[in-house]
Amino acid sequence: MQTSHSLPSAQLPLFQEAFWASNGAPLLDDVIDSPSSASIEEPAAFSELSLSGLPGHCLTLLAPILRELSEEQDARWLTLIAPPASLTHEWLRRAGLNRERILLLQAKDNAAALALSCEALRLGRSHTVVSWLEPLSRAARKQLSRAAQLGQAQSLNIRLG
């Protein structure tokens, strides 16, 4: 059974005033067309992907993304730093990734993984550095972004949960 809820007509003017009162605030079209929106079109150097569920399911969701990155036309490496233990060379093969274009690097802890990620990005020998860093502070995100910009690369952090 459906019930219809209608707003009392006395409330409608409150909403109309909020929507029609511009107070000099730019409309979305004005923001998109402004010169300062050019930075929106530039790809971000740092991205983060959060996947939750069973580890096997998360890797299944991640496989097409990694496959696409491994087949990138850019001749540089796809570097995977501190992946979960289940992401092995055998898993890469079964998932159909181009293993000839992938560097798989382990780190002893989160701090070492962050340092290794920044160095791999900064060197510019990888088109994309995929890391599994948790937790990742705002300062660490900025570090990864700066390193990616220096190396003209992309940083992708995967959070599994």
UniProtKB/Swiss-Prot annotation:
UniProt-listed GO biological process terms: division septum assembly; DNA repair; negative regulation of cell division; SOS response
Pfam families assigned: SulA
Subunit structure: Homodimer. Interacts with FtsZ.
Gene3D superfamilies, A to Z: P-loop containing nucleotide triphosphate hydrolases
Post-translational modification: Is rapidly cleaved and degraded by the Lon protease once DNA damage is repaired.
Organism for this UniProt entry: Pseudomonas aeruginosa (strain ATCC 15692 / DSM 22644 / CIP 104116 / JCM 14847 / LMG 12228 / 1C / PRS 101 / PAO1)
Name of protein: Cell division inhibitor SulA
The keyword Cell cycle appears for this protein: yes
Annotated region (FtsZ binding), positions in chain: 99-104, 106-108, 120-125
Assigned protein family: Belongs to the SulA family.
